């Protein structure tokens, strides 16, 4: 029977003594007279599996069994009490599936993460990145499972959009026009009416606005997909292409929004601790000492702390720390501020609510003081901002006034304003940066290491 290495470790008693077949890649190989010890891994589990091959002609087979070679192994599962991992396969037959040679860049030694970033197509074959992307898979499924269980409908929002939903202006523009030919014309002009859509279009920075439209029909929805920002920031926290999870809920206020965000985060952490225990223990030992306890602490937190933006500014201003970015009311929080609050002051996750309306998006609901909005940011240790959201402005007149104040062209958003014209209601939502969640789950500190094929500045 053909089984995975993960199944062998999980159901060893069942397979013990039985003839089994495993496929995988050689991670290491040792030769002793007429005996070969092969460390095989098929990607399903952190640990390699030992294959013992006896009575073989080493001269014929030695050059074939190179690191990276793929094999099919048939043999009997047995115990070896002398080994720490006391399971092994006594091979009867080994079939070469795909050869490798000495130029294979991943050898049985420690490679730096910076080197492995130069070979993203191969780095997942290492123990480190195998663990990372198994955790990524678990977290992805756990998010879908959480919202399905809570009665949310999964929706798909467009990748191509004419709108800058965040108002940030950092967009990748798309065109089907021959720009090389147009650039040679005198004068050089581009008529977007001749373009595919007859106007300027961009890669999306958020699916939120469309998700709001769906929520005001289906009650509770979420979208989960790639987003794009042409932000020229070469930092460990920024990528040009990344994944965003964005739930939107009708008849939901800011307080309920906070509750959903906390429950979601805790459930994802629980699922990863259960399904990827070995991977997380390995990362705890090799990447970040204390990672396992940090994750458990988040799960055990009964209710995340909630403070106002004003309180956060007061704490930072009175801290005595000489921050590189000056702290004052009306300033956005920099990474150093977020980390001080979560790692030094509170030493745990914290929601910051009631932000000055001048530094938040036009769609966020004004508070009664008319100076702040019902916005929330969830800050967590090491990562900083993980979630950003708000109660949305449901009042048509107020929303139009805010758009005018921010010089946002109303014509392009008439469809969005229709949501307030016809059956408007309170509604809320948030955005979760999936890769930032993975930084927290894995203990890594560079977003390039939690995306299989990163696209960065």
Swiss-Prot record:
Keywords: Aminoacyl-tRNA synthetase, ATP-binding, Cytoplasm, Ligase, Nucleotide-binding, Protein biosynthesis. Gene3D superfamilies: Bira Bifunctional Protein, Domain 2, Nucleic acid-binding proteins. Belongs to the class-II aminoacyl-tRNA synthetase family. It is found in: Cytoplasm. This is Asparagine--tRNA ligase. It catalyses: tRNA(Asn) + L-asparagine + ATP = L-asparaginyl-tRNA(Asn) + AMP + diphosphate + H(+). GO terms for biological process: asparaginyl-tRNA aminoacylation. InterPro entries: Aa-tRNA-synt_II, aa-tRNA-synth_II, aa-tRNA-synth_II/BPL/LPL, Asn-tRNA-ligase, Asp/Asn-tRNA-synth_IIb, NA-bd_OB-fold, NA-bd_OB_tRNA. Homodimer. Its EC number is 6.1.1.22. It holds the Pfam family tRNA_anti-codon. One of its GO terms (cellular component) is cytoplasm. GO terms for molecular function: asparagine-tRNA ligase activity; ATP binding; nucleic acid binding. Signal peptide: none annotated.
